[in-house]
């Protein structure tokens, strides 16, 4: 039921028909062939720590992957260290349909004692990605997918996204390169300014925290 409610909210935001979104299978034959020959830039926790400790502004983008891994406390700790030890401007960017229910990310961040003044909704934060040194994307797949702006046959076409690709560097934490809820590939994985941090979101973030400390 929660998935259907989420789909309804997404389709309202996209001004699209719910049944069409649910029952239209993603087209991926040519896409899969192209994906198989594309390379990613894979990094380590130390790479991520180095980039963030030397940044002026970091925007953290949590998604369902953070919730599934239970990584909110590690994420809050990472943000705290960056702010206090390295004087980095750290903000959290929340997509309205991130997670499995409205407000899912806000609840988890509040549970981890993240300052609500550091948490911003899509409409209030999107313009800041272009001045961010690092976007730390933790399990937020469809809500950051640039295909929402260009691929007319995509189930997420016209859904507003968080413009993370505008950051100087994108650190994308994900267990694998598998598609998200919408079932489509994310070209961000293969972008020149993206470093993939493959693994469990909680473990990866914990390793970064250890390096930052």
Segments (PLM) and residue ranges:
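Structured cytosolic domains appended to multi-pass membrane proteins
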Residues: 36-213
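Membrane-interfacial segments at transmembrane helix termini in multi-pass membrane proteins
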Residues: 1-55
